[in-house]
């Protein structure tokens, strides 16, 4: 998008361009925050898994617990629960993990729905801009016996620019929303799989 087009959008797009711009800034900040939050190293560290497995195999549970406290990832908090309840049956451990896992996934998903809502809001704001522009056009038509085409340009520009800008923000926002949801679902599955491996390792 070149500078002249960007200037045209903000000078001719009308009032509704600005709420869409605010939505785009909010959406981008939420996406970037979530993107870095769910980076794999902050959820499951492969090095941590290797070290934990070595300590479990050697029955060095105190050192394994110390590793959990120092790792500070979601997975390490789940492993800590497993280790603290290692003398209990596997079903009890899995039930406890499920509750804790749901809390962690909820925290990861928090504010994701805002992205989906912002996508819809931008589309609707674009539509409002279209309606506002067309109202301007009809006002001009109703006040002139002979319509001068250039006098309609302002309303038409407002309608087209607002619609285009609304979609320009809404589409990537929705893609980001779906991407984050997909990543969080994959993380949830991986956390379950890795947790079961740790339980089996302790019980066998």
Tell what function each PLM region has.
Residues 1-47:
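Hydrophobic membrane-targeting segments
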Residues 14, 28, 64, 79, ...:
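Residue-level signature of catalytic and energy-coupling elements of molecular machines
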Residues 17-30, 119-126, 169-173:
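Alpha-helical transmembrane segments of integral membrane proteins
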Residues 32-37, 170-183:
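Alpha-helical transmembrane segments of multi-pass membrane proteins
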Residues 43-128, 132-146, 176-204:
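Predominantly long cytosolic amphipathic alpha-helical stalk/bundle segments
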Residues 140-150, 154-158:
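Glycine-rich helix-loop "coupling/hinge" segments at transmembrane-helix boundaries
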Residues 158-175:
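Hydrophobic alpha-helical transmembrane segments of polytopic membrane proteins
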């Amino acid at each position: 998008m070149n500078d002249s087009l960007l200037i045209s959008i903000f000078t001719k797009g009308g009032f509704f361009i600005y709420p869409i711009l605010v939505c785009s800034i909010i959406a981008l900040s939420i996406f970037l925050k979530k993107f870095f939050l769910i980076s794999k190293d902050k959820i499951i560290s492969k090095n941590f898994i290797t070290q934990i497995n070595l300590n479990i195999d050697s029955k060095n549970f105190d050192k394994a617990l110390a590793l959990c406290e120092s790792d500070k990832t979601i997975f390490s908090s789940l492993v800590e629960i497993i280790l603290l309840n290692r003398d209990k049956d596997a079903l009890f451990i899995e039930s406890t993990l499920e509750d804790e896992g749901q809390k962690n996934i909820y925290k990861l998903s928090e504010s994701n729905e805002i992205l989906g809502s912002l996508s819809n809001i931008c589309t609707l704001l674009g539509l409002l801009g279209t309606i506002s522009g067309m109202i301007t056009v009809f006002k001009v038509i109703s006040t002139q016996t002979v319509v001068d085409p250039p006098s309609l340009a302002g309303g038409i520009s407002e309608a087209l620019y607002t619609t285009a800008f609304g979609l320009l923000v809404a589409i990537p926002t929705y893609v980001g929303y779906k991407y984050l949801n997909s990543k969080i679902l994959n993380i949830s599955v991986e956390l379950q799989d890795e947790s079961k491996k740790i339980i089996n390792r302790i019980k066998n």
